[in-house]
């Protein structure tokens, strides 16, 4: 007998199937339904990609009909201990195996070689892993700890995978298109919802060891279909009870975790009966049900709730009453327990009644209704919505089907009616806590269906994208939270910033319009935001492209998986109508693929246009700021030109001709005719009071106005022009209006400015030369006066007899000489103003002339004395003092006149 070991990680469904057959002692090659894969790899088992997540083992699944479709098996590892079994038992199983008109195990996950799995032991012997005795494997404690750690890690990863965003819950039995297993929980992967297998487990009270009995030759196919799923007792198999106990423990763990709702035994029996009828119906023959089918159906039981007792006689009687009610045309309603796991099709319960003819279309009605009436676009709506409360979109789709076509496809369809008291009975069976959880889950499903049906696609905005799929009702709250917390990925120039700056609308239409100061502040903030965005632009582009590519890849994977699931269930579409529906589903998948690509591109275009809208608003603010600057510059430039004209007029007036018509410079006007003309030395640059010309928000150093030269006096007597680059320098003449002698342009000086500058420089040089020569002349005059005083003192000592006359004569000569000298100097200054530049030469010439005059005076006085000595003796001769002094010549000429 084989040993069944339950492992928390998944294994191939085919391996599970081989293990289940090996329990009965049947070789893998002898199992019917697996002969079509004998040429594939025999060395290694095939482990499917879409296996069940760890931590959720289920019962081993046996697939008895191609209409149910493939479904991944629970994660079990079977090590065959004793492969030898009696030949009689093997032959019995093979004989009792009901033949199936269609190919079995068609899913790609079940493509496993039927040859014996072999391996090599350390000694070199080849071991058949299925039929031979396997050696004992000793695992150390350290390896066990590692295995446990790996299992825990796998469980955590599975939980994260199941709860990640965008994954739908596992669909239920009645909601899936191909009647998936009724024991699916809400926490499983969507891969399970795509498969179409049916899981039928038994309670410990029923043995399913032996295969079904061969049908009688005269038995109708309906009875044969029921006997396919009926297990005859087979005593002497202790491992079956062990496996069922493990299944009970697993189901108890699921119920405790809230992933599996307990089920009523009576409802499960009716459900299993209808599923068996649906699976084993032969569409090629018209059958009539017999009482034998009812008897065989009474022995079938599905999974039972682990917290409910074994069905007793009273419950069996209640189940028979329910079956009778279903046969009379009242379908079983969807209960609260089935709401969490699945629903039973109401039309599949009336197939096995005794004495009623059932047509092929009526038998396949439950299979056909789901894929035909539910397009793939509303998969999330139709699979999870209850029949009592369908969404508006589902009602629309169902209403589109013509009534005549429905009557043609489904003859004898009866309107569903609820049997009284049935739902109350089901609620009483369930615990109170499970009732609350089931009700809460139904409310969540209803809310999700309303969101999917009642709204369009979510608004494409960065705020909704960053909040990771917030529902449309929570979008305003999400924007408020986003504005409070700040954006991590979003650029600084967002709708929130534009709304804060009051520029989310156009400036022309904004009430009230922004002032120049507000426009300047907005411009400063926008320029700062642009600069900050430039630092993170590359990283944000890479992140957005990566997220877009990931979303597109996920969408393509989902569509490919959905297409693979539809393709794998091609063997159940055996009617022409079914084939048309199958082709339509494939076309819908292709359309969805194209629509997903188009949606991605259109969303990208919408985002680009919205960003362009933001940038246009920011650019409008910047253009408004530039226009304000231009207007201010033109105003200031006009004022500057006006001041320039005034300065030129004042300069020409101050340098114009005088009243007498003679052009005079500043030096000549200061010395002519003793007039006190206003004279000012151009040496210091005066800062004008033009602060109003400075632009708002700019420093005086950044003023765009051209500056004027500032004339300063140098220490070496020459002049230098210093140009102030920041502020214009204008001249003041003591009056209210300012005088500007010249202006130097910023790029290139004008020729008129150069001429005015040269004239001012010449006038200044003349004035400096005049002042210097005048001071030297005063010094020379003082020296001459000192010299005269010394001579007078000497004369006094030499001629003491005539001191008074000598003093008077000297005073007269001094007065006459000083007056004549002053007149001469003034005359020379008036007539020859340029001679003032050569005062040193003039004074040297004057000194030479003075020396010559003294020499000539002495010579003339000597000659006069010698002539008088040669004259008559009666006349007096010259004294020694007269002969020595040159000024006595005048007296000698006056004495003969007096005599």
Curated annotation (Swiss-Prot):
UniProt note on tissues of expression: Highly expressed in smooth muscle such as aorta, colon and uterus. Detected in the brain, in the thalamus, in the hippocampus and myenteric plexus. Highly expressed in megakaryocytes. Down-regulated during macrophage differentiation.
Main subcellular location of this protein, as a coarse class: membrane
Chain residue ranges for the region called Interaction with PRKG1: 140-172
Any GO CC annotation of this UniProt entry: sarcoplasmic reticulum
Compositional bias of kind Basic and acidic residues: 266-281, 759-770, 777-787
Biased composition (Low complexity): 181-203, 699-715
GO biological process, one term: negative regulation of smooth muscle contraction
Keywords of the record: Coiled coil, Cytoplasm, Membrane, Phosphoprotein, Sarcoplasmic reticulum, Transmembrane, Transmembrane helix
Region of interest: Disordered: 32-110, 164-286, 324-391, 463-486, 695-722, 757-818, 867-899
Modification comment: Phosphorylated by PRKG1/cGKI.
Annotated region described as Interaction with ITPR1, given as residue ranges: 521-567
Top-rank taxon: Eukaryota
Localization: Membrane; Cytoplasm, Perinuclear region; Sarcoplasmic reticulum
Mutant lacking the gene: phenotype: Mice lacking coiled-coil region N-terminal part exhibit disruption of IRAG1-ITPR1 interaction. They have dilated gastrointestinal tract and disturbed gastrointestinal motility. Smooth muscle are no more relaxed by cGMP after phenilephrine-induced contraction and half of the homozygous mice dies before the age of 6 months. Nitric oxide (NO) and cGMP-mediated inhibition of collagen-induced platelet aggregation is strongly suppressed in platelets of these transgenic mice. growth.
Comp. bias (Basic residues): 100-110
Biased composition (Polar residues): 171-180, 333-351, 876-892
Subunit field text: Part of cGMP kinase signaling complex at least composed of ACTA2/alpha-actin, CNN1/calponin H1, PLN/phospholamban, PRKG1 and ITPR1. Interacts with PRKG1/cGKI-beta and ITPR1/IP3R type I. Interacts with HCN4; regulates HCN4 channel activity.
PANTHER family for this protein: INOSITOL 1,4,5-TRIPHOSPHATE RECEPTOR ASSOCIATED 1, LYMPHOID-RESTRICTED MEMBRANE PROTEIN, JAW1
Note: IRAG1 gene is a common integration site of murine leukemia virus, leading to induce myeloid leukemia in BXH2 mice. Murine leukemia virus integration occurs at the 5' end of the gene between 2 differentially used promoters and thus probably alters the expression of an important gene for myeloid cell growth.
Function: Plays a role as NO/PRKG1-dependent regulator of IP3-induced calcium release; its phosphorylation by PRKG1 inhibits bradykinin and IP3-induced calcium release from intracellular stores. Recruits PRKG1 to the endoplasmic reticulum and may mediate the assembly of PRKG1 and ITPR1 in a macrocomplex. Involved in PRKG1 signaling cascade leading to inhibition of platelet activation and aggregation. Also mediates NO-dependent inhibition of calcium signaling in gastrointestinal smooth muscle contributing to NO-dependent relaxation.
Name of this protein: Inositol 1,4,5-triphosphate receptor associated 1
Organism listed in the record: Mus musculus
Gene assigned in the entry: Irag1
